[in-house]
A protein has these predicted regions:
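Rossmann-like AdoMet
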Residues: 1-94, 98-150, 305-311, 329-347
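Long, Lys/Arg- and hydrophobic-enriched amphipathic alpha-helices
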Residues: 200-347
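Short helix/loop capping segments that flank catalytic or ligand/cofactor-binding pockets
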Residues: 44-45, 163-165, 245
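A residue-level signal for conserved active-site and pocket-lining positions in enzyme catalytic cores
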Residues: 35, 154, 286
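A short SAM/SAH-binding and catalytic strip from SAM-dependent methyltransferases
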Residues: 149-172, 211-216, 220, 228-235
Length: 350
């Protein structure tokens, strides 16, 4: 408890300093970046085990590779094909979680992978990954950022949803950017909107109040990836929607979600630093951004259809009943099958 309190105090001091530098107002994307990624005090710096199947493990959320090892084994089919097209023996994973997906891909691809690079900002997660992947240690390398030149197949599972977003809020038909302030009278962080010229990429029908996210960092990431991807392709798996669903008039409260001990809420201004903050992905916007930066959209579908296309059912023929049951969670509509999507981008010649 003392460690948690000191970390919370450290994060609070950092937020207060940032608020002072910003004349008392902090854009939400900056707030989200500090809360999640500030060295030593952010969520991913101090949460020793954010990913796991059960709250009793101290985890906050579960990802597909932990639901079933057949996620990575099936994804390996598509990764292998992309590696052959790109004539590369390198896989680059961005944000590798606890290392489960890397283990599954390395195990399935075997000698076809000569180098497996991981871009990971969390020291805790690096330690978890190193322990899980020690059997593949000669191949595995950790990086602090994307390489200047990439000749590889890139994989990002639940990465885009954790990138900081701006919040756009339409009130009385006027658009504002939502930011964070500190209220000394209540001793709490609170919302404050400021007028902005920024707009969502599509017109929002109706004149009702409306809140949505603007994926500024994910778009910047796509532009950087486009600049540096010399040869190869990239697979991004995440929960989200195409633009017409993401900006649906009835989705007027946005998609921002927090996760703590496998429970979700929509208030990032409470339990700051103790819970994950995410936003669903506008896959249309991400694909368009990648295309405008010079990449080609090679495929987009639901996770269920993607895994079925890669031969999941055939791969499960010799699996145990329990393994089949777990794998079905990856493709069932009410589990991960439809909400999660897969986007593949790359160079046109791949």
């Amino acid at each position: 408890m003392e460690k948690q309190a000191s970390l919370a105090t450290g994060l609070h001091r950092l937020l207060q300093a940032s608020l002072q530098a910003g004349e008392g107002w902090l854009p939400f994307d900056r707030f989200m970046a500090l809360v999640l990624y500030a060295p030593g005090v952010g969520y991913y710096s101090q949460r020793s085990q954010p990913i796991g199947r059960m709250p009793s493990q101290g985890s906050d959320f579960v990802t597909a590779p932990l639901v079933s090892p057949w996620f990575g084994r099936t994804l390996a089919v598509a990764v292998q094909e992309a590696m052959q097209h790109a004539q590369t023996t390198t896989v680059l994973e961005f944000g590798a979680g606890d290392g489960s997906l890397a283990f599954q891909l390395l195990d399935a691809l075997g000698d076809q992978v000569e180098r497996y690079a991981i871009v990971e900002v969390s020291a805790h997660l690096r330690e978890m990954q190193a322990k899980r992947l020690q059997g593949f240690s000669p191949k595995v390398q950790w990086l602090d950022a994307l390489p200047e030149a990439i000749e590889a197949v890139v994989v990002g599972n639940e990465v885009l949803d954790a990138m900081p977003v701006k919040l756009l809020h339409r009130v009385n038909q006027t658009w504002h950017e939502r930011g964070v302030i500190w209220e000394p009278n209540t001793g709490r962080y609170a919302w404050q909107d400021r007028p902005t010229e920024a707009r969502p990429p599509v017109a929002i029908e109706g004149d009702h109040d409306y809140l949505c996210e603007s994926p500024v960092q994910a778009n910047a990431f796509m532009r950087t990836l486009a600049e540096r991807l010399r040869r190869g392709a990239a697979f991004f798996i995440d929960y989200g929607f195409p633009a017409h669903e993401f900006y649906h008039p009835q989705r007027h409260m946005g998609t921002l979600m927090c996760h703590h001990h496998h429970r979700s809420d929509a208030d990032p201004l409470t339990d700051i630093g103790a819970k994950d903050i995410t936003a669903h992905v506008d896959f249309t916007g991400i694909a368009l951004c990648a295309q405008e930066a010079g990449l080609t959209c090679l495929g987009y579908t639901s996770q269920a259809q993607f895994l079925l296309n890669c031969g999941l059912l055939r791969l499960l023929e010799d699996a145990s009943p329990l393994e089949r049951q777990q794998a079905m969670m990856l493709i069932q509509d009410h589990e991960m099958g439809e909400l999660f999507k897969v986007l593949e981008i790359g160079r046109a010649h791949v």
